Amino acid sequence: MTSAGVFNAGSDERANSRDEEYPCSSEVSPSTESSCSNFINIKVGLLEQFLLYKFKMKQRILKEDMLKIVNPRYQNQFAEIHRRASEHIEVVFAVDLKEVNPTCHLYDLVSKLKLPNNGRIHVGKVLPKTGLLMTFLVVIFLKGNCANKEDTWKFLDMMQIYDGKKYYIYGEPRKLITQDFVRLTYLEYHQVPCSYPAHYQFLWGPRAYTETSKMKVLEYLAKVNDIAPGAFSSQYEEALQDEEESPSQRCSRNWHYCSGQDCLRAKFSSFSQPY
């Protein structure tokens, strides 16, 4: 799926013309299954682009409009196409497609976190930044609740998000992460205690503890990887324990734990340096 997510009227016409080439019929054969799979993939991608365009333009999302994109003749496949498109948008952008008015079948893409402007942060016709923030929270959790700057930038490199470059969705990543996410208190970014020379690390901020939890973040990671949350056994146990505490208790405990561990590591490192 392209990040731009731009839809135009011509796309619907071209896709509908391809329906004749890739029909899903009741006849079962290898060629029919392949054609049906191709058809569904095309429609999933088209519906994703349509939904992201509606989000970007802050326009209403109606079921009847989604059916038009898929083509009303293929209502039998609509449920699967709708599910796959919404799930893919969820794992990429961390927004959920929700029916906000069942009477008129009105839908909206809702950010998993309460970032300003429904995940956009800044005013304008832009796409949500929630996916990058959720990914950062995952990395911090997997790194023992505090992740050093070098590890986080290496992870972003793996996602082909590079420091110093400007991106259509995220703008300048360093500014978004170290300024916007920190200013909104979803992340904390500060010098590692007792470190010399100075090293810097990321922790969850108070707002992250209030609006989400380790279990929810782990469930998001599991969905991205299409596995059960329990597959991350040690993190799953930690997430279960955290469910019994308040957000402020979790925030305080993890901050003190990371500070103590980092100070010990820094002292050990200084003793091990050759003279």
Swiss-Prot record:
Compositionally biased tracts (Low complexity): 23-33
Family annotation (PROSITE patterns): MAGE
Record's compositionally biased regions (Basic and acidic residues): 11-21
A GO CC term attached to the entry: nucleus
Chain ranges of the MAGE domain: 40-239
Tissue specificity annotation: Expressed in testis. Not expressed in other normal tissues, but is expressed in tumors of different histological origins.
SMART domains per UniProt: MAGE
Chain coiled-coil ranges: none
Keywords, sorted A to Z: Tumor antigen
One Pfam family in the UniProt entry: MAGE
Chain positions covered by the region annotation Disordered: 1-33
Top-level taxon of the source organism: Eukaryota
GO terms under biological process: negative regulation of transcription by RNA polymerase II
The name this protein goes by in its record: Melanoma-associated antigen B5
Organism the protein comes from: Homo sapiens
Taxonomic lineage from the root: Eukaryota, Metazoa, Chordata, Craniata, Vertebrata
Gene from which this protein is expressed: MAGEB5
